[in-house]
């Protein structure tokens, strides 16, 4: 039967149909090429970004608050919470301006000791936070303490460097050890000396003193008990001001008048020496012995 009905048989016979072999011989159609990406200019990319969002108040205000908070934390840490491991590391801006707070770890002589700097004190967690404990062993404290020289006084010398002990040196050392050991003190630093110590006016609060917990000047307490003399060196004397020097000399005069401590019997004893005179005599003897050894 013809299909469509109006078509002739001759037309259908004249129209060839592609055979299977011809279809196999036809080359495959190539895939369509992808459209190339247009080259974007960097300036166009930057300009296309919406920078206006960074100028809105909802962005500026939180950014300013966060930046101010970070800078404030850094400033507070550098000014109030930075720990000084030794006297050399104390910033010069502290001298005659600020103080350091710490716990006394050892007393070397009648007028000097070592403290472990605890910036911020108990408010910063020292003494009650697990990671802010003051070390107790000598190994842990090595190179971690500030060597402090009491300002304005000179105590009798203990035996060291081959020199004998000065009279009343042991009593002064024992009193200072009992008065300061393991206690928290505040030291108003004045300067560094030639022995890598800081000369400081030191204050302590004690419950057993009367009135209790009143701030005590350690140098003044030693002078009024006759445990030290006013510092008499020609250079390097530090008192914390002319008013403190007058206060110290008045305390020394009263101790001398009452014959307390090292002033006991000093008027009748012709061989009595002050700590400064003792150091001067020992220095001259060392020089004489040195010349004799060379000759």
Curated annotation (Swiss-Prot):
Q: Name one GO cellular component term.
A: membrane
Pfam families, per database record: SNase
The alphabetical list of record keywords is:
Calcium, Endonuclease, Hydrolase, Membrane, Metal-binding, Mitochondrion, Nuclease, Transmembrane, Transmembrane helix
Q: Secreted: is it a keyword of this entry? A: no
User: Which residues span the membrane?
Assistant: 60-76
- Which residues are noted in the entry as Ca(2+)-binding? 154
Instruction: Please give the InterPro entries that the UniProt record associates with this protein.
Output: SNase_OB-fold_sf (IPR035437), Staphylococal_nuclease_OB-fold (IPR016071)
Q: Which domain of life is it from?
A: Eukaryota
Cellular compartments annotated: Mitochondrion; Membrane
**Which residue positions are annotated as catalytic?**
149, 157, 197
* Entry keyword tRNA-binding: no
Q: Using the UniProt record, name the top-level EC class of this enzyme in a single word.
A: hydrolase
Q: Provide the membrane topology annotation.
A: Single-pass membrane protein
Bias (Low complexity) occurs at 15-36
Name of the protein in question: Probable endonuclease lcl3
Cite the source lineage: Eukaryota, Fungi, Dikarya, Ascomycota, Pezizomycotina
């Amino acid at each position: 039967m013809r299909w469509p009905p109006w078509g002739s048989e001759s037309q259908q016979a004249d129209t060839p149909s592609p055979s299977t072999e011809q279809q196999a011989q036809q080359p495959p159609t190539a895939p369509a090429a992808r459209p190339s990406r247009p080259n974007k200019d960097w300036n166009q990319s930057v300009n296309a970004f919406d920078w206006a969002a960074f100028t809105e108040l909802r962005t500026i205000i939180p950014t300013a608050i966060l930046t101010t908070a970070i800078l404030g934390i850094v400033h507070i840490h550098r000014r109030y919470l930075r720990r000084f491991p030794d006297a050399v590391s104390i910033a010069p801006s502290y001298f005659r301006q600020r103080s350091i707070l710490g716990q006394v770890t050892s007393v070397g002589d009648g007028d000097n000791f070592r403290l472990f700097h605890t910036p911020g004190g108990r408010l910063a967690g020292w003494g009650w936070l697990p990671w802010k404990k003051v070390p107790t062993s000598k190994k842990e404290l090595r190179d971690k303490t500030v060597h402090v020289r009491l300002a304005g006084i000179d105590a009798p010398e203990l035996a060291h460097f081959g020199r004998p002990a000065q009279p009343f040196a042991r009593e002064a050392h024992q009193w200072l050890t009992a008065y300061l050991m393991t206690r928290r003190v505040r030291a108003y630093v004045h300067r560094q000396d030639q022995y890598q110590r800081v000369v400081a006016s030191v204050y302590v609060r004690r419950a057993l003193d009367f009135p209790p917990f009143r701030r005590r000047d350690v140098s003044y307490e030693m002078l009024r008990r006759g445990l030290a003399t006013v510092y008499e060196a020609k250079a390097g004397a530090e008192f914390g001001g002319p008013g403190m020097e007058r206060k110290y000399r008045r305390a020394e005069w009263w101790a001398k008048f009452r014959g307390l401590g090292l002033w006991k019997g000093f008027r009748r004893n012709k061989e009595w020496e002050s700590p400064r005179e003792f150091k001067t005599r020992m220095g001259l003897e060392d020089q004489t012995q040195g010349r004799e050894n060379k000759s």
